[in-house]
């Protein structure tokens, strides 16, 4: 699937920057174009892989390149005012070669959480291609203002995109890690999961063709109903075969020698085990998978370690667990890979306790901020006025 990726804000820019690096290293053919948008000049300068002419600084007249200070209402205003500058960078994207737009943003900050929904609305008005969002939720320990920003941005972002893929920082934090190390690892996790998902079906010249191809239309159809999506991932190390002579026919027939039957059974069992682990393990947004409207399963790895029987069994298991009859599946052969990975996209999930918890904390933070503001006005009056009101101000 060929994507035009737009990173909005600091977190969004870093994730898209990482996607460009991933795409280049693996020759995956996912990122057709990449743009970074920010109101903080320093954040744009910190990017390594996005071309400099595709980095857009907005809000210079309002915030002088210093960011919006976690004020996402200001972030939304700036994005609306400077949308033409962003469009200028998007104009250089060969849209006829793109399957969809992906707007990536952290939902807890100011620029991204305010500006990403504005950009998504703008793109949907102009282009016929689907516009997806990738929203990153802040950790619950990051503070009330970031939780409030995330709850408000999430609500708006879901309405403005064709589908919102969500990654929850809370589910991926590790104790004792540095701030920088923690975010780098989280960005790595995001890119690995979505890289396998979007990379399936993008075959370059000379590459192995999948037995059951997952092309961009299958991903688009899985995301078509809108709402919120989550992604599961599991992998297992394997020994790649020295001579990759098996190819498509051997995978269809179960091997080129009769004694390959044991290997076929082992391969099938590994695939079904990976599917279960991906669906029931750590999802990008933890939720109950029962009730998901649609699902897509992609198995990636050396071609000799993939087979149709395992994928069919995995697909059937997902149907049983979700109750959905709209479960697509396929493989993504990567000759010479040292692991087999299973990726599951669950679209239209609704039983998400983390979102309800986020909203509850946000409401408390909103009430608390208003209360403190009122108290602050009263306390300031008490401080500056004398008790008997005998002093007169200068003017």
UniProtKB/Swiss-Prot annotation:
InterPro entries, per database record: CetZ, CetZ_C, FtsZ/CetZ, Tubulin/FtsZ-like_C, Tubulin/FtsZ_GTPase_sf, Tubulin_CS, Tubulin_FtsZ_GTPase
Keywords for the protein's UniProt record, in alphabetical order: Cell shape, Cytoplasm, GTP-binding, Nucleotide-binding
Gene Ontology molecular-function annotations: GTP binding; GTPase activity
Chain's role: Involved in cell shape control. Essential for the development of a rod-shaped cell type required for efficient swimming.
Binding locations of GTP: 10-14, 110-112, 142, 169, 187
PROSITE patterns in the cross-refs: TUBULIN (PS00227)
Main location: cytoplasm
A single BP term in Gene Ontology: microtubule-based process
Organism of provenance: Haloferax volcanii (strain ATCC 29605 / DSM 3757 / JCM 8879 / NBRC 14742 / NCIMB 2012 / VKM B-1768 / DS2)
Highest classification ranks of the organism: Archaea, Methanobacteriati, Methanobacteriota, Stenosarchaea group, Halobacteria
Matching HAMAP family: CetZ
Name by which UniProt lists this protein: Tubulin-like protein CetZ1
Consequence of gene loss (knockout): Swimming defect. No differences in growth rate or cell size.
Gene3D superfamilies on file: Tubulin/FtsZ, C-terminal domain, Tubulin/FtsZ, GTPase domain
Any Gene Ontology CC annotation: cytoplasm
Stated family: Belongs to the CetZ family.
Protein localization: Cytoplasm
């Amino acid at each position: 699937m060929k994507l035009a990726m737009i990173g909005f804000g600091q977190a969004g820019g870093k994730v898209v920057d990482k996607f460009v690096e991933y795409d280049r290293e693996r020759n995956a053919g996912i990122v057709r174009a990449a743009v970074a948008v920010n109101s903080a000049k320093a954040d744009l300068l910190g990017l390594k892989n996005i071309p400099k002419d595709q980095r857009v600084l907005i809000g210079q007249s309002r915030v002088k390149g210093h960011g919006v200070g976690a004020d996402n209402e200001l972030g939304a205003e700036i994005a609306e005012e400077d949308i033409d500058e962003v469009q200028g960078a998007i104009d250089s994207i060969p849209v006829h070669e793109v399957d969809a737009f992906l707007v990536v943003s952290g939902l807890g900050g100011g620029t991204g959480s305010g500006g990403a929904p504005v950009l998504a609305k703008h793109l949907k008005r102009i282009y016929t291609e689907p516009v997806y969002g990738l929203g990153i939720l802040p950790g619950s320990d990051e503070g009330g203002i970031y939780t409030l920003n995330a709850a408000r941005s999430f609500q708006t972002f879901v309405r403005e995109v064709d589908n919102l893929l969500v990654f929850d920082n809370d589910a991926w934090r590790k104790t004792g890690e540095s701030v920088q190390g923690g975010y780098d690892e989280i960005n790595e996790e995001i890119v690995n999961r979505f890289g396998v998902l979007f990379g399936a079906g993008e075959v370059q010249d000379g590459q192995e063709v999948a037995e059951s191809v997952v092309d961009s239309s299958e991903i688009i159809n899985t995301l078509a109903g809108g709402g919120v999506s989550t992604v599961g991932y599991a992998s297992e190390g394997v020994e790649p075969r020295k001579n990759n002579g098996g190819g498509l026919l051997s995978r269809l027939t179960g091997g080129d020698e009769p004694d390959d039957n044991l290997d076929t059974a082992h391969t099938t069992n590994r695939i079904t085990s990976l599917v279960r682990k991906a669906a029931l393990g750590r999802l990008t947004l933890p939720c109950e998978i029962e009730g998901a409207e649609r699902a897509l399963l992609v198995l990636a790895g050396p071609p000799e370690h993939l087979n149709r029987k395992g994928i069919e069994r995995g697909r059937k298991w997902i149907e049983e667990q979700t109750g959905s009859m709209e479960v697509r599946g396929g493989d993504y052969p990567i000759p010479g890979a040292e692991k087999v990975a299973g990726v599951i996209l669950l679209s239209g999930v609704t039983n998400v306790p983390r979102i309800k918890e986020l909203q509850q904390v946000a409401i408390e933070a909103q009430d608390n901020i208003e209360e403190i503001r009122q108290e602050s006005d009263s306390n300031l009056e008490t401080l500056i006025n004398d008790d008997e009101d005998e002093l007169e101000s200068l003017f």
